[in-house]
Amino acid sequence: MNVYQTIANFGTNILESLGLEAALSPTLSNTYIYGIPVLGAIFSGLITKKLTKSTAKSLIVQALFVILGTLAFLVITLASPAKPETGAFNQATLWIAFVVICFIMFFIGANRSIFWSTITELKVNKEIVGLAVGFISIIGFSKDVWLSPLLTGTTNQFIVKNSQGTSFYSQQALVAWAIFALINACLALLVTYMIVRKVKYGKVWVNPKFKKVFALGEQQYGH
């Protein structure tokens, strides 16, 4: 998921551009990259077992929360800096942004912990499971190759220096990251929705209104 890579790769830059002291960056980055997703994974396993009873259903609910988080992040980045001469936002905005980032990473960790289980629900032929996993991995992890150079090249033009000579990313870069994350969160929801339909109806785009008609036809004509 590109939302994860955006926050994992640029989360420190985002928070420091919002006014975070460099000394706190390692602690906070380890918290939202490694600590929070583990909690999300535990949460995802529990709700899948106790509530949704379906990996696909859990994924779509959690994907909606990721979208909610990225929307909140976009709103935060659109707020005007409290101190334009330094580029720093006020402390309240900084810590709200950190909480939102943790919220996003919580549900990303939740999704990443169970998404391979959809292979079972999709009833992928056991003979091609290895091939399917490999193909999915090529597509899914290829972003690690191109994402950082793409976003870095796009946002480096927005690097500025404050009156103390410290470099930080301007508001335009923060908004660009937020929009990119939101777009990818929406795409993730679309893919998850397709998985849910495939699990439920056997086909991605079958209109559920015709499902009963097809079932009656199969019973009547034996097809």
From Swiss-Prot:
Topology with respect to the bilayer: Multi-pass membrane protein
Localization terms from the record: Cell membrane
Domain of life: Bacteria
An annotated GO cellular component: plasma membrane
GO molecular function (one): transmembrane transporter activity
Entry keywords, A to Z: Cell membrane, Membrane, Transmembrane, Transmembrane helix
Positions of transmembrane segments: 28-48, 59-79, 88-108, 128-148, 176-196
Protein's name in the database: Uncharacterized protein MPN_113
Species assigned in the record: Mycoplasma pneumoniae (strain ATCC 29342 / M129 / Subtype 1)
